[in-house]
Amino acid sequence: MKVFVLNGPNLGRLGKREPA
């Protein structure tokens, strides 16, 4: 859930876990 919030700046790292 929180990964979605950081999906912007951390799209490379958290984007792989939660491509929301």
Curated annotation (Swiss-Prot):
Xref: SUPFAM superfamilies: Type II 3-dehydroquinate dehydratase
Keyword entries, A-Z: Amino-acid biosynthesis, Aromatic amino acid biosynthesis, Lyase, Quinate metabolism
Temperature curve summary: Optimum temperature is 76 degrees Celsius. Thermostable.
Pathway: Metabolic intermediate biosynthesis; chorismate biosynthesis; chorismate from D-erythrose 4-phosphate and phosphoenolpyruvate: step 3/7
UniProt catalytic activity: 3-dehydroquinate = 3-dehydroshikimate + H2O
Site (Transition state stabilizer) location in chain: R17
A GO BP annotation: aromatic amino acid family biosynthetic process
The enzyme's E.C. designation: 4.2.1.10
A GO term for molecular function: 3-dehydroquinate dehydratase activity
InterPro entries on file: DHquinase_II_sf (IPR036441)
Keyword Lyase among record annotations: yes
Superkingdom classification of source: Bacteria
Functional pH dependence: Optimum pH is 9.0.
Family: Belongs to the type-II 3-dehydroquinase family.
Subunit relationships: Homododecamer.
Function per UniProt: Catalyzes a trans-dehydration via an enolate intermediate. Is involved in both the catabolism of quinate and the biosynthesis of aromatic amino acids.
Protein name per Swiss-Prot or TrEMBL: 3-dehydroquinate dehydratase
